[in-house]
A protein has these predicted regions:
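Short acidic (Asp/Glu) and glycine-rich catalytic loops that position anionic groups and cofactors
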Residues: 34-38, 169-171, 210-216
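Secondary-structure boundary elements
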Residues: 122-128, 153-161, 197-202
Length: 281
């Protein structure tokens, strides 16, 4: 196992080892497939939400890609970043490892980062002795894997913590975030990080809402999530190894698929129309 502190973001993401993001991209549970994984491999990916997340990380952790505002003189008269000058400036900023944003878009970044640091539990976690942006490389089940902790603490009386900062456009409350965990496979990420590190550490998600008042919550996942994540991480590694060995990266099935309604839809139909029949009688 190799542990590297302060590895530049670009250097980490161009490494060939399988990451938890790649693992989830392989799995149909998260809308993935080997074909989608192969297509994305080696391609740079960015989005407005991705940029916001990276900028908040940098503001809270003090490391990573800093967000910088477009100069007014490169913007169009309506304020759009659509001019040739704006695009060239943005390209140069990204080349420097920074994130171009309009000045108005920087205010929520400040709001979110300040909200995280005001939250007593979140702040206490980030102030524990340890390191920020810790990159770990190892081998699990014969597959070379990697993980990048936002923060990894030293041993504390409560144990070693891996900490992951998430921004969300939904609520950060537990009832909502548990659905987000299932949707995006954060339980797979958590277990992937544990297995890559080779330690059964505690893992905390610090979640901040992306709209004012930028509410914050801190969550740990329970044992059922741990078991589910462990199973899916294993499935992803095995699938990756098989695809690599055969150089075959399948997408959707090629034959005709006969579909049946989901259980919830069938039950809703049955309840509605069974009730209608009773009323008519």
């Amino acid at each position: 196992m190799t542990v590297i502190h302060d590895l530049p973001d670009a250097d980490y993401h161009t490494r060939p080892e399988l990451s938890s993001t790649g693992a989830r991209l392989l799995l149909p549970e998260f809308g993935g497939s080997p074909a989608k994984f192969k297509y994305r491999q080696g391609r740079e990916y960015t989005s407005a939400a991705f940029d916001v997340g990276k900028a908040v990380h940098a503001a809270v952790l003090g490391v990573g890609a800093e967000a910088v505002a477009y100069p007014e003189d490169v913007l169009a008269s309506n304020g759009a970043a659509s001019t040739k000058a704006a695009k060239e400036w943005a390209d140069s900023v990204r080349f420097e490892g920074k994130i171009p944003m309009k000045a108005a878009d920087l205010r929520p970044i400040t709001g979110m980062s300040e909200a995280v640091l005001r939250h007593p539990t979140a702040r206490a976690l980030f102030e524990l002795p340890g390191h920020r942006e810790v990159s770990v490389f190892s081998e699990v089940d014969g597959v070379k894997v990697r993980a990048r902790f936002d923060a990894l603490t030293d041993e504390t009386p409560q144990g070693v913590f891996g900490i992951d900062l998430k921004t969300t456009s939904d609520s950060a409350d537990g009832d909502t975030f548990t659905k987000t965990v299932v949707k995006y496979g954060y339980h797979v990420q958590e277990q992937w990080y544990r297995e890559t590190l080779g330690q059964d550490i505690r893992f905390a998600f610090v979640v901040v809402e992306s709209t004012a008042p930028y509410l914050v919550a801190v969550h740990e996942l329970g044992l059922a999530y741990k078991d589910m994540g462990k199973t899916l991480a294993k499935v992803a590694r095995d699938l990756y190894a098989e695809c690599e060995a055969t150089n075959t990266w399948p997408g959707h099935p090629e034959d005709v698929q006969v579909l049946e309604p989901p259980v919830w839809a069938a039950m809703a139909h049955e309840e509605r129309y069974a009730l209608s029949s009773e009323i008519r009688i």
